[in-house]
Design a protein with these regions (language model features):
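Glycine- and aromatic-enriched membrane alpha-helices
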Residues: 1-431
Length: 431
């Protein structure tokens, strides 16, 4: 085994920690958007995304995605890296790395980085199903979905599989598919899964007739800022080295996020006459989503343009749920689906040296379209099978009475805010 590059190792471990922070960030982002009677349940759904994913990744998820030999371009052998046996070994009673990846940091460090990606992908789905699903069903779904959807998708895109730069689709078209940090694997995948579950479990009581206002907009803003901060590890860490590409990714994601926040705000101002804090938070995230697959291959100008386009499109897309009648509670489809698809496709226009407007030809656009649609199809089919099976066996939803009374009390037996208890204590002190 060669010498460990301590700089790269430290950077990837730092990036893994930043990406891990994104799931608590999205917990606050979504937690502020729900009504007060459902905020604890949302935080618990995100906690399950962290915990269950970690267990599955340790057991066989890592092996399916990255450790095992390729099986049909779709997944790896789940046994070869079972319990991370390929990534660490005991020496004198202390576990250490068994090998190095291409940038000379231990495989175990890559395990840490990649599991954080799996966690946030699962965590994004929660927003669509807020306020009505059972915690127990969600935990089972996470275990199955990471196994049969996320891990194979990561293998297909990032480990030489069907949708990778060297995969069968890229070879057939004659252009290398590009997804730097998760336009397909994370955002399109999560959004499609969210939509499928929503269509199976149905709408919240009062959808379309009652206003579902966020109960804590400062939580939403805090979550958005934490997500932006975590995104530095999410994208800059995807350079897999402490190098210039990592530095440039930091710049491009911030440029896109800033542009999207502004363009979302301008769109809102035209439509409703206000620049809202909710819009600013959502716009930031939309820009971050759109630049994710392209952060290393678009110029600063195109990063700003991509962010601006994404801000407008995602803002408009969030209203589609009312037109088509699907209850995507917190706009996972509008922000992550439309944003992820937009970013993936715009590489075909703006990708340096390959995009139509950046010195390339039509092939890059074609391959980006194909991998996006294959990702949509795979996620839709796998999620539909899992979600439908759960619906027909243990069921997804709490009862209508529990939903109306508040899922926090029904599922967690707690309230986030004990206003009655506080008022009672104050009255006693006054007396």
């Amino acid at each position: 085994m060669g010498a460990i590059d301590s700089g790269n190792t430290a950077w990837i471990l730092t990036s893994a920690s930043l990406v891990f922070l994104m799931t608590p960030g999205v917990a606050f982002f979504y937690g502020g958007m729900v009504r007060a009677k459902a905020v604890l349940n949302m935080l618990m759904l995100e906690a399950a995304a962290l915990s269950v994913t970690m267990i599955i990744w340790t057991l066989w998820g890592w092996s399916i995605a990255y450790a095992g030999s390729d099986i049909g371009g779709i997944f790896g052998d789940p046994a070869s890296g079972f319990l991370l046996k390929d990534s660490m070994v005991a020496q004198d009673g202390v576990f250490t790395a068994t090998g190095l990846n291409g940038n000379n940091y231990p495989v175990s460090v890559d395990v840490a980085f990649q599991v954080a990606f799996a966690m946030i992908t699962v965590g994004l789905i929660c927003g669509a199903i807020a306020e009505r699903v059972k915690y127990s069903t969600w935990m089972i779904f996470v275990a199955l979905w990471v196994t049969f959807d996320y891990a194979p998708m990561a293998h297909m895109v990032w480990n030489g599989g069907l949708l990778s730069a060297g995969g069968a689709i890229s070879k057939a078209i004659g252009a290398a598919a590009h997804d730097f940090a998760g336009g397909t694997v994370v955002h399109i995948n999560a959004a499609v899964a969210a939509l499928i579950i929503v269509l199976i479990i149905g709408k919240r009581k009062g959808f379309g007739t009652q206003p579902f206002r966020p109960h804590n907009v400062p939580f939403v803003m805090l979550g958005a800022f934490l997500l932006w901060f975590g995104w530095f590890g999410f994208n800059a860490g995807s350079a897999f080295a402490a190098n210039g590409t990592a530095g440039y990714a930091w710049v491009s994601i911030s440029a896109a996020a800033a542009a999207a926040m502004l363009s979302w705000g301008f769109t809102e101002k035209i439509r409703s006459g206000h620049y809202t804090a909710m819009g600013a938070a959502s716009g930031m995230v939309a820009g971050l989503v759109a630049i994710t697959p392209a952060a290393d291959v678009v110029s600063p100008l195109w990063a700003i343009v991509m962010g601006a386009i994404a801000g407008v499109l995602t803002c408009l897309a969030c209203g589609l749920k009312f037109k088509f009648g699907y209850d995507d509670s917190l706009d996972v489809v509008g922000v992550h689906g439309v944003g992820g698809f937009t970013g993936t496709i715009l590489i075909g226009f703006f990708g340096e040296g390959t995009g139509l407007l950046a010195g390339g030809d039509w092939k890059q656009l074609v391959v980006q379209l194909v991998i996006a649609f294959v990702a949509i199809l795979y996620s839709a089919v796998i999620t539909a099978i899992i979600a439908f099976a759960l619906e027909k066996t243990i069921g997804w939803r709490v009862t209508e009475a529990q939903e109306v009374g508040g899922i926090d009390l029904a599922d967690q037996g707690e309230r986030a805010y004990d206003f009655a208890g506080t008022a009672s204590s104050v009255l006693k002190e006054v007396k």
